[in-house]
Amino acid sequence: MMATHWTGLPEEDGDKLKACGAASACEVSKNKDGKDQGEPVSPSEDEPFSWPGPKTVMLKRTSQGFGFTLRHFIVYPPESAIQFSYKDEENGNRGGKQRNRLEPMDTIFVKQVKEGGPAFEAGLCTGDRIIKVNGESVIGKTYSQVIALIQNSDTTLELSVMPKDEDILQVAYSQDAYLKGNEAYSGNARNIPEPPPVCYPWLPSTPSATAQPVETCPPDSLPNKQQTSAPVLTQPGRAYRMEIQVPPSPTDVAKSNTAVCVCNESVRTVIVPSEKVVDLLANRNNPSGPSHRTEEVRYGVNEQASTKAASRTTSPASVPTAHLIHQTTGSRSLEPSGILLKSGNYSGHSEGISSSRSQAVDSPPVSVNHYSANSHQHIDWKNYKTYKEYIDNRRLHIGCRTIQERLDSLRAASQSAADYNQVVPTRTTLQVRRRSTSHDRVPQSVQIRQRSVSQERLEDSVLMKYCPRSASQGALTSPPVSFNNHRTRSWDYIEGQTEATATVNSESQIPDSNGERKQTYKWSGFTEQDDRRGIHERPRQQEMHKPFRGSNLTVAPVVNSDNRRLVGRGVGPVSQFKKIPPDLRPPHSNRNFPTTTGVSLQRGIAQDRSPLVKVRSNSLKVPPPPVSKPSFSQHSLASMKDQRPVNHLHQHSVLSQQTQFRSESTFEHQLETEVSSCLPGTSAKTSPQLSENLGTSDLELPAIPRNGDINLQEAEIQQPDVLDNKESVILREKPQSGRQTPQPLRHQSYILAVNDQETGSDTTCWLPNDARREVHIKRMEERKASSTSPPGDSLASIPFIDEPTSPSIDHEIAHIPASAVISASTAHVPSIATVPPSLTTSAPLIRRQLSHDQESVGPPSLDGQHSSKTERSKSYDEGLDDYREDAKLSFKHVSSLKGIKITDSQKSSEDSGSRKGSSSEVFSDAAREGWLQFRPLVTDKGKRVGGSIRPWKQMYVVLRGHSLYLYKDRREQTTPSEEEQPISVNACLIDISYSETKRRNVFRLTTSDCECLFQAEDRDDMLSWIKTIQESSNLNEEDTGVTNRDLISRRIKEYNSLLSKTEQLPKTPRQSLSIRQTLLGAKSEPKTQSPHSPKEESERKLLSKDDTSPPKDKGTWRRGIPSIVRKTFEKKPAATGTFGVRLDDCPPAHTNRYIPLIVDICCKLVEERGLEYTGIYRVPGNNAAISSMQEELNKGMADIDIQDDKWRDLNVISSLLKSFFRKLPEPLFTNDKYADFIEANRKEDPLDRLRTLKRLIHDLPEHHFETLKFLSAHLKTVAENSEKNKMEPRNLAIVFGPTLVRTSEDNMTHMVTHMPDQYKIVETLIQHHDWFFTEEGAEEPLTAVQEENTVDSQPVPNIDHLLTNIGRTGVLPGDVSDSATSDSAKSKGSWGSGKDQYSRELLVSSIFAAASRKRKKPKEKAQPSSSEDELDSVFFKKENTEQSHSEIKEESKRESETSGSKQRVVVAKESNTKKDSGTTKEEKKIPWEEPPPPHSSKRNRSPTLSCRLAMLKEGPRSLLTQKPHCEETGSDSGTLLSTSSQASLLRSSTKKSTSPETKHSEFLSIAGTTTSDYSTTSSTTYLTSLDSSRLSPEVQSVAESKGDEADDERSELVSEGRPVETDSESEFPVFPTTLTSDRLFRGKFQEVARVSRRNSEGSEASCTEGSLTPSLDSRRQQFSSHRLIECDTLSRKKSARFKSDSGSPGDTRTEKETPALAKMFDVMKKGKSTGSLLTPSRSESEKQEATWKTKIADRLKLRPRAPADDMFGVGNQKPTAETAKRKNIKRRHTLGGHRDATEISVLSFWKAHEQSADKESELSAVNRLKPKCSAQDLSISDWLARERVRTSASDLSRGEGLEPQAESPSVLGTPISTHSPPSQQPEARVAATSTLASTSQSPLFTPPQSPDQINRESFQNMSQNASSTANIHPHKQSESPDTKAETPP
């Protein structure tokens, strides 16, 4: 609407006089300058400033410039309109005058005046329209030229300005002109984007005669506003008056083209809509404007400059928004305005026309093209000092002045336009619709166009314009440019609905006051421009339509001359309009299919664009527009915008057009019925239609395309003459024959203008216009008051627009006009043209149709198809049938869209005319009403519900038209109960119900959107209701037939399916409902039935499940969902259809033949309804339903009925999609590429990895590539809504990774080892979808963070290890769980077997996942609740875990450094023993947190560890922070794994709690587990490193021996009962976890305890160090993987397994990690400032190192409690078992190294603590007793223990030196209890025992630090370490959810 949208400086050019006004009447401007608006001049000749006189101001340039900014406010006609103009030329429309090309109405006005600036001093005011710059008229100049003139002016700038009140565009689009727009453009004029090509020169070429109705004095004011406005106004004034003058009319048209925006604005200015226009403009600018732009772009069929068109469209869209409202009142005005536009007054024309129109109506066709003295007055802009006066005198003033005034004017103008009759009412109606349309399409263009369309309907030309208007609506601005005459009308809609009104008014008014004039204008003007106006103007309108629609929908083009345009959503109507001769036109009005088709197309287009249809209806029914105008304008604008984009869609254009076509036909029919009285109603109906279209456009479009095409073709064929007339007013043509009737009169009036029909007819039209105006005003008032007279209007104005739950749906729906829907419903496309007459004939039906259409719009114009069948039910069904026949798949696809649901809502409201706002008003004439017992059989989700679910309710039922309203109270009639929105009985099936209920006198009502039971008091009452409802449902014969057939066929299918499914009846209703829902988009209870509602979806899901299976199976299904899912997946339907078939053999999607239809449908459905559905794709669907759907789909996709209830269950749909990919014989990532993908994913370099993946993806077969691209985009869309659906890319990757990235053969090894890769690949694909599927030249993706999370967290080495372990998949499930450990022992690096076993475990665990998790949770909960130790453990866990990790890491590092390969070997064996692996894991985790242990830093790698630990602190923490998310994410997908793992962990942790040693080993294993969570390899490596380095040679030997005994740790664990550590272990409590834990912990742990005590700081530190470095790296790499896996149960299991397995790989990793640990320690040293925790941790760790240095016995002494022994694994075999369980549990929590990161951070803290411990040793015991941090809990026992530890640590550090220190870190890495002094450890042990996870962890970590420090100072660290401990100790983690939560990175 505003140039701002497309113009670079729409709002302001900049501080430098940015002329932000639209150069609306460039040519007019010339006229304005030199000519009197009153004097007839060619548009170019007329000075836009012929108005009483522009004010001249002299500005002196200053350094600040001239002190004002300009705004170029442009109401652009769509490029399609411009093309229409060309078409007009081609069709002989006055030689295709350029003026006919809708030129953007623009106004360059002063946006701001800087106070104190030259402009301010000169008196320049905001809103002053620039008419001349330095004496040079701006008319015909581009904004940049104007700016250049200003900028190039000398020191003095002479500006001729027109007051704001005189600027039509500003007046009409006051809000848009000021509220919307781009920021001030402060650049050179040359840089100012030029608006879309404006045919200003063309305007001048327009015959002056028409434009000359120089009464454009007021237009002058407009021209002042709009540069061309003045001329336009002048001409418009004349044109308005001269609207009667046919020749001037062409000129006006030219001007109209120029002044399109102006006209639009004028219309708005003149008409009440201006206020709404402003509002709408604001709306439109935001949504509508862009929408217009979008639409124009989408429809940019004829958009010469898509961008410019969009700009114009946007600008016009803004204008039309207001314009729609304006149109409502200014509909008639618009017609005169159209004349004015033709006159060539661009700006002035709009406003003038609006004004003139009113005046024209009021005044006789005196001097200028005005119909009446008012017209004369209007014409005489000069007579008024201000446009305001002019308007005031003109009465359109109400509409022209302020928006409020215009709104008032709309009402008044409707009446006043009653003078105009057709014009104003039409315009009002059009404005309402138009506003929506213009809002959607091109603000002004659309609005004007709507007006024009209305007018065109009112008048033949107007009807043509109506179609163009529709086009305008579609591509509001551009279309006006297209036609000259038609364009004028279109411009009337677009640039000035005023113009359209003027044109129509001319036509309409001509019959009234200037019947002759109208003919003169339309006929006279068109007489000379008869072809031009009838043919030329109509073509022009068509062209306009085309541009508008072409831009938006290409509707105009479609309407104009070819079905292709119709396909574009405008061609058909355009051609009809263009070619409709007067002769043909009457036939059209007589239901000539050609004519009807033309109108229908136009309307379809309008409806497609919503406004267009509305416009059409509006023209026919003026009264409705007022009501519908406000409501529809806003909603329509919103929905129109959406619609417009939808319209841009391929099918939608055609569908919408077709639907609109039909709707228009139907509307025409109805309108004809109510020509005079229903003309306003028609407008209202049109508005509803528009609104409805908005609602249903999306669906309708798909359905419409084929039907629409047929309709267009037939229409075109039938109306070749119509093409000649080029009149979009096929409806009007009908009025030719039916001119006697008010609507026919209006039609005739339009026809007269177009076909040069006799003035008498025009007069007749005029009378209808007057009557219509009165009716329109009344109806507007009624509508505003929720009146019932124009149901369509009310609905369009309020309900339909409001009803669409989702804008997108509305947009889509809007695309399919109600009439188009009706047309579609109309079995005969050709009869679409005929149908409009029918529509006209049955105005009330039209209302319903409108409401119905709007609702139907969602279902691709199914309801709309049957215009007469206003209810969506019938028309929808019929349309559905037609669509099925014509575009079945497409339609179904559309129906699958959300729009369908909206359609339902709209449908519901359709019947009520204005169900929400004016249900009672609309249907005040209730056919029947009374109290009935009501019970819905089908929920909003389309699911059948039992009586208990939906009890009977007593409702006051009111049957109005096709709507059945249910009220809880008779007094609530105005407000239908929320649950019972109006039920559309159109084409409903009603019968006596015997089976649904035992009650008597119950009849069942089945509609397209609902199924319900009603119980009457007695049989007679029931039969009476049935009869009444049947009659109401058959109001539209055509629709009813189709709909009933559809319902019946659906019912039959449903019954058949139900018979097979046992739930026959319920399912049938549900199915029908679902069908209706899908097609219509909503149930009869649209509110409750939001397709996007997750709850509804879930309910629907449940219902659908019930549907698919007998209700008795519900419990079974629920209980057996997992088994069912497996069965479903196992059950592979015959590969005859969709599932189990190669991608290239699958039925292709309609949009992309390389994408399977099922994928397209499922994704679309999910995107439509499931984006906000929590857990979409995660929550499985009903297996029975999935299997059933698979079978059906395999039978044939052609039978897919997305409306079926089973398609309502998002979970089923999502599961269906997953099942499809799972069943693909050739995986999406093909078998031959699978290995490459896995390998690529493991690349170290993130960019290289991504590039390789991209290359591989692009190397996929085309079907696979396209499907993957589509699916990735879909998943990305889903992930983008992760805040609501909780499905982040990681979660989606977990869900889809194994499904997409797999091999045809189910290889457990691959499943296990490659799962992280699969997750990662899919996650990466989702995250970088845009990059992956762009051209090679695309910039590199941002992989730093992502790669760190995904690639780093999942290092290739880990994968390799997993692969190697995979070779050892022969392990039992329990072994599998342990196999990670044993495998790592065996293949020390081959994590594959562990993963294989893990995968097996996953299989088992998946079965027991829920149970395991549940058990795990209770255990975790129970364990933490041990005692104060529990609290300590909570903090100590974190702190101690970190500390112990730090020690372990340091020790591991030292050991790694010292032992290196030796440790590797040992670790290999140790890894065999779970203790070692656990230790390794702990150490690995600790390395991340190693910085804290000062001992370790003192020792071999103490510095390194410090640095690394510091780094780990920071890095690991972040990782941990990340990990928790991953873990959480993975928790869903990894539920099975985590469940089983956790279960085993619980077992082990239970045992672990018994023995501290077990805890220690568990801790280690946990660390390993954590590490291995996502990247199993990493975890295993960590474990190995940690174990080997951490464990002393003895321990290692023990581990080796144990490894020998149990070749696989898992075997040993299994034998020991420790399988819990592995994922399987958790799943398989069978393994004596206690035994395993005891043995491992006793043997290994004792050794470890000794070695750890000796080497806890040394060997363990070295191990930790060694493992730490790699573990850090790998962990970092693994984090994302871990997160992913953690999300996945399998991942958790894997991590658990890997944790166990990591023992052996840990050795290898120790070396690898050694550097990392060293780095970490260095980092720790550098970044020791982990916090006070680190300092205490280090000092404590030093003390603890001393303690560890002390002999184990000494340490045990220090820790006299049994827990200390347990920690060491000395005498706590039982605890060891428990500990093992806990370890396993914890490991599950830790999965994927979540805890590793935490532990690493803890280790960092521990280092710091150890260092501080050294210092602390110097502190007094009391000081030490004091908590180092507030987080630290002061425990006397802990303090004593720490003191002991400190003392022992000091001794140890002195005695053992670095070795003990290293040991201490190792100890830190190992369970703290093992390392902590005996005294402390017992305490810790107690805590651990009591809290298992919490206490154990805290004590475990406490030892590395002095007990005091660990417990006190380290408490913070422990709290931090608790997470790390939790990470390290899976069982502990399981034990303590807190720890788990903390643990996740």
Swiss-Prot record:
Residues 499-512, 589-600, 674-696, 1590-1599, 1658-1681, 1729-1738, 1871-1882, 1907-1927 have a biased composition (Polar residues). Residues 1782-1792 have a biased composition (Basic residues). The record marks R1178 as: Arginine finger. The modification Phosphotyrosine is found at Y876. Residues 1141-1333 form the Rho-GAP domain. Residues 347-358, 1377-1395, 1531-1556, 1569-1589, 1887-1896 have a biased composition (Low complexity). It is a peripheral membrane protein. This is Rho GTPase-activating protein 21.
